[in-house]
Amino acid sequence: MMIKQYLQVTKPGIIFGNLISVVGGFLLASKGVIDYPLFLATLFGVSLVVASGCVFNNYIDRDIDRIMERTKNRVLVKGLIDPKVSLIYASILGIAGMLLLYVGANPLAMWLAVIGFVIYVGVYSLYMKRKSVYGTLIGSLSGAAPPVIGYCAVTGQFDMGALILLLIFSLWQMPHSYAIAIFRFKDYQAANIPVLPVIKGISVTKNHITLYILAFMVATLMLTLSGYAGYKYLVVAAAVSVWWLGMALRGYKATNDSVWARKLFVFSIIAITSLSVMMSVDFNVPSSAGLLTYVG
């Protein structure tokens, strides 16, 4: 029973979601030549670091998790794991993950994990989430770290491809997170968390969602235009972005914002999964390096 609780506190769903993006970044950089020991070290290393961040987040958020309907049954809220033990557990997971990335991948992969971890736990969870409407923006940087780690584990350098991945996944996080904040509006309001819908209103949030999806659309296309992904990826990226944008625009006429936001949220997961899969398999670019100058 205790094993189940120690697993739950790491938020397995979040770990799995992040692993899909790690695979996308890793295989994009591998170009069909897969180093399997490196692949496994990267997957397990990132999994451990993400798990650590989630446990620390659960520890930090115990007070607000009690208030929110969605989180009131979390392991630490119900006292199923001693808070002090959870801190030790989180520390062990984090150190193990970072060591694995350092030894099994490369120092750059480890440092990117450290930066993502510090932003998520230190900047976002401890401060920005509770104090600023810009918390979501800061948190998006840590959410974009896994695919960049996967990519840099292979390349050993932070090039234009890594930067484009950072942009794609950071920009994706914003509409994804704002959608959650809309359909969980009452929870965030009750817990006094200053997310955009609560502070500025849902109408303003819809404008932000639309703008971020437009920016996301441009960023996704850059992966092909800069010579990193193929044209099959480009077609899927364009189709997914246009559909997501259409869903966002329909939000202006929505009679039930909660239902609309939930649909937008669900599609955001489909969208990013589709892109991760396509960049994994469509890494060959026909003849020329791309429509824009290749940097790598």
UniProtKB/Swiss-Prot annotation:
Family: Belongs to the UbiA prenyltransferase family. Protoheme IX farnesyltransferase subfamily.
Membrane topology: Multi-pass membrane protein
HAMAP family, alphabetized: CyoE_CtaB (MF_00154)
Function as written in the Swiss-Prot or TrEMBL entry: Converts heme B (protoheme IX) to heme O by substitution of the vinyl group on carbon 2 of heme B porphyrin ring with a hydroxyethyl farnesyl side group.
Pathway annotation from the record: Porphyrin-containing compound metabolism; heme O biosynthesis; heme O from protoheme: step 1/1
Species for this entry: Yersinia enterocolitica serotype O:8 / biotype 1B (strain NCTC 13174 / 8081)
GO molecular function, one term: protoheme IX farnesyltransferase activity
EC number(s) on file: 2.5.1.141
GO biological process entries: heme O biosynthetic process
Annotated transmembrane regions: 14-34, 36-56, 75-95, 99-119, 133-153, 163-183, 209-229, 234-254, 265-285
One Gene Ontology term, aspect cellular component: plasma membrane
Gene responsible for this protein: cyoE
Organism phylogeny: Bacteria, Pseudomonadati, Pseudomonadota, Gammaproteobacteria, Enterobacterales
Note: Carbon 2 of the heme B porphyrin ring is defined according to the Fischer nomenclature.
Keyword Nucleotide-binding set for record: no
Substrates-to-products reaction catalysed: heme b + (2E,6E)-farnesyl diphosphate + H2O = Fe(II)-heme o + diphosphate
Domain of life of the source: Bacteria
Keywords tagged on the record: Cell inner membrane, Cell membrane, Heme biosynthesis, Membrane, Transferase, Transmembrane, Transmembrane helix
Subcellular location field: Cell inner membrane
Protein name per the record: Protoheme IX farnesyltransferase
